[in-house]
């Protein structure tokens, strides 16, 4: 499949099929609150369970059903842990068209949210943003 992709074939997926496009794939499980459901209540380090995806997108993490299932905190948590990766939150009936060397095109009925954290700062409760 990867050879076809490199050769210019169109690869697509919905739901988990979209998530598996990235090298780092979100499984949907939480380490700290395994029974919390689809809505991620907090931004927490080392909480999101990931596995290796197909790797068509090597510098991105894809999350699906994004706004509908309120998965902002899940994707923010991962992007903060892996600032070299860009997080793409994709809604239902929406697609990201990725072609070599060009901007991503958003098509469909809803939106794609992009999180990029290379200059992000994280402050724990009670800490200052200017220092420890």
Label every model-predicted segment.
Residues 1:
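Active-site or ligand-binding cleft "flap/edge" segments
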Residues 4-24:
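Catalytic nucleophile loop
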Residues 25-27, 31-132:
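C-terminal and late-domain segments of enzyme folds
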């Amino acid at each position: 499949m990867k050879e076809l992709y490199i050769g210019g074939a169109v690869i697509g997926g919905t739901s988990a099929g979209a998530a598996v496009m990235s090298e780092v794939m979100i499984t949907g499980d939480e380490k700290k609150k395994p029974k919390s459901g689809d809505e991620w209540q907090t931004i927490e380090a080392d909480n999101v369970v990931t596995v290796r995806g197909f790797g068509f997108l090597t510098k991105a993490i894809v999350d699906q059903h994004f706004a509908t299932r309120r998965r902002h905190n899940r994707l923010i948590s991962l992007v903060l842990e892996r600032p070299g990766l860009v997080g793409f939150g994709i809604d239902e009936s929406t697609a990201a068209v990725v072609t070599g060397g060009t901007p991503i095109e958003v098509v469909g009925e809803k939106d794609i949210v992009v999180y990029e954290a290379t200059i992000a700062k994280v402050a724990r409760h009670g800490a200052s943003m200017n220092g420890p």
